[in-house]
Swiss-Prot record:
Cross-referenced InterPro entries: AceGlu_kinase-like_sf, Acyl_CoA_acyltransferase, Asp/Glu/Uridylate_kinase, GNAT_dom, NAGS_kin, NH2A_AcTrfase
GO molecular function ontology, one term from the record: L-glutamate N-acetyltransferase activity
Record's protein name: Amino-acid acetyltransferase
Cellular-component GO terms for this entry: cytoplasm
UniProt-listed PANTHER family: AMINO-ACID ACETYLTRANSFERASE, AMINO-ACID ACETYLTRANSFERASE NAGS1, CHLOROPLASTIC-RELATED
Gene symbol of the encoding locus: argA
E.C. designation(s): 2.3.1.1
Location of this chain's protein in the cell: Cytoplasm
Domain N-acetyltransferase, first and last residues per copy: 286-425
Keywords: Acyltransferase, Amino-acid biosynthesis, Arginine biosynthesis, Cytoplasm, Transferase
PROSITE patterns to which the protein is assigned, alphabetical: GNAT
Length: 432
């Protein structure tokens, strides 16, 4: 079977979920200048064709720097914000204007090679961002540098309803006709909040947020962000992370940080279960909970391969339905990726931990330990003092977690009578 067939099958729930959703996408000036920009444009057009309501916010910092260099003007910054005097503002207007036109042209040019071939893709921009001056901070007059006051929510939604892609530049206008240079991150964050967007997607040079060992941090809650900001200092990843958290605190369900240098990063983030970047979200991305009858199908998908390998005892659908209240599960984006069951043993203060299973793709994230802790807590609440486990293949895993070798003679009679000598499982016990 071709690989793309399998990919489409896995992506189909996301295609359906994203239809008619509002996404605000922020692409910094470095991203527009990157060789992968053409692929990003194509992916944006694909999203539009799938029914996503798109607001694209572009940056322009390197393009402004180039204009300043051409005129021999030295850039001035304070706290990583540009001080925009009159001469600098002229360069900003020039760079932003040319870049906006270039993006519009690129979106139009890619139509022949996009899913929108044969239809009219409309890109619209305008004076929908109202701004105000930052003013004087710490004795520094920022002059024409501003901050977003509001975006025209009704106007933008009207355009999105009419199937326009809305393009926002890092310029804002005051009611008195002044022009202000804005940070594209600020524009994107405020647009996402004011539009009650479903997602804010932030492009950066890196794959996403990396930890101290250089590993990708896939998910974060807004309350976890400050610790990472302190570690990152004042680099651009910190700016993106701060913007993502601010959007979530403002009501945006999910914010994503992805790489503009990686071909397909946007689609990977949106149409695969684990994505390819960093997700910041208020709600729990992965949930440990008690199983419900609706989980039986997912449980069977998880444990059947392990039953076929002889690792787990076979359980029919009827058995699972009857014993579903004994199970705890780990759910990730609607998929059951791990499970465990607790069976109290009659006429004893003992219980059996059974059917502990983790999807092979998720076996290195501590989910087995998480389920074990949940089962132990549940057992204590039921007055169980000794937990037994029978296993044929994972003895060392349980030994490392405090289980001691045991025997059939140690099992309560109600469980010992059911012991399968042909299977010859090793028995372990743990006082809890």
């Amino acid at each position: 079977m071709p690989e793309y067939v399998n990919w489409l099958r896995h992506a189909s729930p996301y295609i359906n979920a994203h239809r008619d959703c509002t996404f605000v996408v922020m692409l910094p000036g470095d991203g527009v200048a990157h060789p992968n920009f053409g692929n990003i444009v194509h992916d944006l057009v694909l999203l539009h064709s799938l029914g996503v309501r798109l607001v694209l916010v572009h940056g322009s910092r390197p393009q402004i720097e180039s204009r300043l260099a051409q005129r021999g003007i030295t850039p001035r910054y304070h706290r990583d914000m540009r001080i925009t005097d009159t001469e600098t503002l002229e360069c900003v207007i020039d760079a932003v204007g040319q870049l906006r036109i270039s993006i519009e042209a690129r979106l139009s040019m890619d139509m022949a090679a996009s899913p929108m071939q044969g239809s009219r893709l409309r890109v619209t921009s305008g004076n929908v961002v109202t701004a105000r001056p930052i003013g004087v901070l710490e004795g520094i007059d920022y002059q024409h540098t501003g901050e977003v006051r509001r975006v025209d929510r009704k106007g933008i939604n009207r355009l999105l309803d009419e199937r326009h892609i809305v393009l926002l530049s890092p310029l804002g206008y005051s009611p008195t006709g002044e022009i202000f240079n804005l940070a594209c991150e600020d524009v994107a964050t405020r647009a996402a909040i004011d539009l009650a967007a479903d997602k804010l997607l932030l492009f950066g040079a890196e794959t996403g947020l990396l930890d101290e060992q250089g590993r990708l941090v896939r998910e974060l809650r807004p309350q976890q962000v400050p610790a990472h900001l302190q570690r990152l200092g004042g680099n651009y990843q910190a700016e993106l992370l701060d913007a993502a958290a601010e959007a979530c605190r403002g009501g945006v369900a999910r914010s994503h940080i992805v790489s503009y240098a990686e071909d397909g990063a946007l689609l990977t983030e949106l149409f695969t279960r684990d994505g390819g970047g960093t997700l910041v979200a208020q709600e729990q991305f992965e949930l440990v909970r008690e199983a419900a009858i609706e989980d039986v199908g997912g449980l069977m998908d998880l444990i059947t391969p392990l039953e076929e390998q002889g690792i787990l005892v076979r359980r029919s659908r009827e058995v699972l339905e009857r014993e579903i209240t004994q199970f705890s599960v780990v759910e990730r984006e609607g998929l059951i990726i791990a499970c465990a069951a607790l069976y109290p043993i009659a006429d004893s203060e003992s219980g059996e931990l059974a059917c502990l299973a983790v999807n092979p793709e998720y076996r290195h994230g501590g989910r087995g330990d998480e389920l074990l802790e949940r089962i132990e807590n549940r057992a204590r609440a039921l007055g169980i003092k000794t937990l037994f486990v029978l296993t044929t293949r994972t003895a060392h895993w349980f030994r490392e977690r405090g289980f001691e070798p045991s025997s059939v003679d140690r099992l309560p009679s109600a469980r010992a009578s059911l012991y399968n000598f042909q299977r010859n499982s090793k028995i372990f016990e743990k006082a809890i």
